[in-house]
From Swiss-Prot:
The keyword Ribonucleoprotein does not apply. There is a cross-link at V11-P17 (Cyclopeptide (Val-Pro)). Processed by the macrocyclase-peptidase enzyme POPB to yield a toxic cyclic heptapeptide. POPB first removes 10 residues from the N-terminus. Conformational trapping of the remaining peptide forces the enzyme to release this intermediate rather than proceed to macrocyclization. The enzyme rebinds the remaining peptide in a different conformation and catalyzes macrocyclization of the N-terminal 7 residues. It comes from Amanita fuligineoides. InterPro entries: Amanitin/phalloidin. This is MSDIN-like toxin proprotein 3. Belongs to the MSDIN fungal toxin family. Probable toxin that belongs to the MSDIN-like toxin family responsible for a large number of food poisoning cases and deaths. One of its GO terms (molecular function) is toxin activity.
Length: 32
């Protein structure tokens, strides 16, 4: 799962920085 999220994260940031920030928060919560 982590690898998939890591691959999609840069794409989200590229399309929308705001969405990228949310994605980072979700990843942090998932890993935490």
């Amino acid at each position: 799962m982590s690898d998939i999220n890591a691959t999609r994260l840069p794409v989200w940031i590229g399309y929308s920085p705001c969405v990228g920030d949310d994605a980072v928060a979700l990843l942090n919560r998932g890993e935490g």
